[in-house]
Amino acid sequence: MTLAPSIDHMADLAEKAWAGLPEPFRAAAGPVVIRVLDFAEDELLAEMGIEDPFELTGLYHGVDLTQASVADPSPRPAEVFLYRRPILDEWVERGDVTLADLVEHVLIHEIGHHFGLSDDDIHDIEDGRR
């Protein structure tokens, strides 16, 4: 019997995805903390107007690089949250992608927000890669 991928397993996939990104990309991003949780907190979902916790697979939290200032540095590094259960749910529903590829996709999407890109910008970039 195979067990469902754990938070630690998904964190390992995310770290491998991060390490596999081109060095210039990682250097430009600067310090980014990757956190894996089962779900987003209820308060966050309420703030975002999301009723179904399975709708949020990832979240960028921090000051995007277009807003960052040397004169007023952020007291905390940027954080990317990956939500295990929604990612697993999407992975099972899709059935056409590996879990590692889906984790990488969500991670890159959220890092795109770190660079100040909108969802539309990120989708345009992804469409150009296909």
Spans of model-derived segments:
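Acidic-residue sensor for enzyme active/binding pockets
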Residues: E79, E110, E126
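Short, highly charged C-terminal tails/helix-capping segments
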Residues: D120-R130
